């Protein structure tokens, strides 16, 4: 597969359908799907939005927390619960009423790889994006440096 530079991604961000096999683990398989989108934005590794229906039943619990993205709109957050009762706080988010350019994200959920046990893109375990705000999935195909770490929020 070809490498991608995060500096070649557009701003405003681009929404792209993907059939890549995506897997998230938290107390077993949390989600496994080929029904997903990825958002590509300058300086950011891809953020994957996975079909909500493909998550393990009762894994996502909406919490009273939100943020606003200038491109996608208001995000709603979820805690993720493992079968053993372990909880990952604010570990996923979605856009219940996304802006016009991102309407296709309705019904799709993104996961912070740093808050669950492991995430995979086509069998490759991802690295997490630095910081605690962005939820990019970094594979060996992604070339940085990536926004998120100390001193990069103004990029």
Q: Which residues does each predicted region cover?
A:
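Terminal leader/tail segments of proteins
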Residues: 1-155
